[in-house]
From Swiss-Prot:
GO terms for biological process: potassium ion transport. It is a multi-pass membrane protein. This is Putative transport protein YbjL. It is found in: Cell membrane. Signal peptide: none annotated. The chain crosses the membrane at residues 8-28, 32-52, 66-86, 94-114, 158-178, 383-403, 406-426, 447-467, 475-495, 540-560. The gene is ybjL. Its main location: membrane. Keywords: Cell membrane, Membrane, Repeat, Transmembrane, Transmembrane helix, Transport. Pfam families: Asp-Al_Ex (PF06826), TrkA_C (PF02080). One of its GO terms (molecular function) is monoatomic cation transmembrane transporter activity. GO terms for cellular component: plasma membrane. Belongs to the AAE transporter (TC 2.A.81) family. YbjL subfamily.
């Protein structure tokens, strides 16, 4: 039996889609030196090659893909978006605006200089900034712009072409810039990170290991009684001196949970909870061969929970003000916008931040009730909320504004982005509403993006050879300029206008470009994870601004003549 693969793929859109996805994902795993191509560029390259062979796909799949992607981007940004926008993220907001705004203006200027259409210009902006949200926003606005169908088809093809030609240029140039730009300025990045660490009492180790607390029991002997000198536990400050706290005491056969007024007596058996290294550093008066193994004394349920910051008595406060250790709890991680932050006593908590806390189950529950709620560990998605807000986003996208003879619509991209932000924000405030497991959110976002990339590549593939010959050299120059010039402008603004610490500034710049590989290089250069503070500050707002930039470039273009 002979099977004509071309006819088979042309006759089955679903099969074609998944063949493109599978081949593209395989290609995306290849590395060029230390740079991995990535899923997006892999799927785009495969779809462009198949598009040259005149394979095509139903545009409805493309539309659904971009809608799912941009909605999930909003859901991820929602918990921290408003806190960054309205409160302590002024510098980060300004940096993101400078980065995106300068890139938009430069792209518009180069597009007019080289005589490109809006499709090539917007695609070049999206590729140079390695930003799919720009591509999504521009494509959606073009479809709702009301231009003639032949012009629309050409613009959409050129949009994909511009993105494909400049994506790798943007990615490689930014990674090279992240490696060498810190060396061209007079302040050493490692020194800047250490300065912040000294000022804020941070651990500068980017590879800090996290251990769970353990419980061990000791019998109080004369050395320990002498060491306490008759002071109660509150006066002794056991945790400050040892890194452990006393969870239980057995006295005269009676097991009790001590309060701050308890005084240790000869023969007491005490259960100490702390990290392994804290136990190893204990004064010999605690240990000295007096460790005991009492099942009841050691029978404690140590749990690790992720607590979402929500309550007003925690939002806006510094981490140190929570006094977790005073309540017998240990902080393992601080996560903001899926970025692990340095454990900094001076970090101001935002609504939606996640604290990973370990300790006795009762104590952790008490702390969680005080500052927010324990994150749900269910793997079930609230599909009702997901669908409801998706519908709201589509309805918002239908809104159109009319100014004399000129009209423009918000578009599906902006509408879905806003609806996603609201869902994410409400989820951060109401533990049982709109829950979407992070794995499910990542899967839907990634799948939507891959479907979108497959669609744009297949639709643009037939014209890539002609386009590459006509504008290839111009695209190379424009891609480099749009990729690197905004980074330099943003650095000058942050360093000499905002006067930011350089470690935080470079992290914030990579966040404004939403480029995780470049962020890793900055952290390696600083030999610290402190730049992650800046990265998290700009990342959420930049994702939103980049989507709006894709919409704005299409709206502004006709007015430039």
């Amino acid at each position: 039996m002979n099977i004509n693969v071309a006819d088979l793929l042309n006759g089955n859109y679903i099969l074609l889609l998944f063949v493109v996805l599978a081949l593209g994902l395989c290609l995306g795993k290849l590395r060029l030196g230390s740079i991995q191509l990535g899923n997006s560029i892999g799927v785009l390259v495969v779809s462009l090659l198949l598009g040259q062979q005149h394979f095509s796909i139903n545009t409805d799949a493309l539309n659904l893909g971009f809608m799912l992607f941009i909605f999930c981007v909003g859901v991820e940004a929602g918990p921290n978006f408003f806190s960054i926008f309205f409160r302590d993220g002024k510098n980060y907001l300004m940096l993101a605006l400078v980065m995106v705004g300068s890139a938009l203006l430069i792209a518009l200027g180069l597009g007019k200089l080289f005589g490109w259409d809006i499709g090539l210009t917007a695609g070049m902006l999206a590729g140079s900034m390695t930003s799919t949200p720009v591509l999504v926003g521009a494509g959606d606005t073009l479809r709702h712009s009301g231009i003639a169908s032949t012009q629309l088809s050409s613009a959409l093809d050129n949009l994909s072409l511009g993105y494909a030609l400049t994506y790798l240029i943007g990615l490689v140039s930014l990674i090279v810039g992240a490696r060498y730009l810190p060396k061209l300025q007079h302040q050493d990045l490692q020194t800047s990170a250490q300065q912040i660490a000294r000022e804020r009492g941070l651990d500068t180790d980017a590879n800090r290991k996290v251990y769970l607390p353990v419980i061990r029991a000791y019998r109080v002997g004369p050395e320990l009684v002498a060491w306490t000198d008759g002071k109660n536990l509150r006066e002794l400050g056991i945790y400050r001196q040892t890194g452990c706290y006393i969870e239980r005491i057995r006295r005269n056969g009676i097991l009790a949970n001590p309060d701050g007024d308890a005084v240790l007596q000869m023969g007491d058996e005490i259960a100490l909870v702390g990290y392994p290294d804290a136990h190893a550093r204990l004064d010999p008066s605690f240990r000295n061969g007096k460790e005991v193994f009492d099942r009841d004394l050691l029978d404690m349920r140590i749990v690790t929970e992720e607590i979402v910051v929500k309550n007003h008595n925690a939002v806006g406060r510094r981490l140190a003000q929570l006094k977790l250790t005073d309540h017998g709890c240990f902080l393992n991680r601080v996560i903001r916008s899926q970025i692990e932050m340095p454990i900094d006593d001076n970090v101001v908590l935002n609504k939606g931040d996640v604290l990973q806390v370990s300790g006795d189950a009762r104590r952790v529950k008490t702390i969680a009730d005080r500052i927010g709620f324990i994150s749900i560990h269910s793997q079930v998605t609230d599909l009702l909320a997901f669908c409801a807000f998706f519908i709201i986003g589509l309805m918002i996208g239908m809104i159109t504004f009319q100014f004399s003879n000129f009209s423009f619509g918000i578009g599906n991209a902006a509408g879905l982005l806003f609806a996603g932000i609201m869902l994410g924000f409400l989820r951060a405030n109401h533990p049982t509403f709109g829950y979407i497991p992070q794995g499910a959110l990542n899967m839907v976002k990634e799948f939507g993006l891959m479907v979108f990339m497959a669609g744009v590549g297949l639709s643009a593939g037939s014209g890539i050879s002609n386009g590459l010959g006509a504008v290839g050299g111009q695209m190379l120059i424009a891609g480099l300029v749009v990729s690197l010039a905004p980074v330099v402008i943003c650095f000058l603004f942050g360093a000499y206008v905002l006067r930011m610490n350089r470690a935080l500034l470079f992290g914030a710049m990579m966040g404004a470009r939403t480029c995780a590989p470049a962020m890793e290089i900055i952290s390696d250069t600083a030999r610290s994870n402190i730049p992650a503070l800046g990265y998290a500050g700009t990342y959420a707002i930049a994702n939103v601004l980049l989507t709006l930039a894709g919409t704005l470039i299409v709206i502004i273009w006709p007015g430039l003549g």
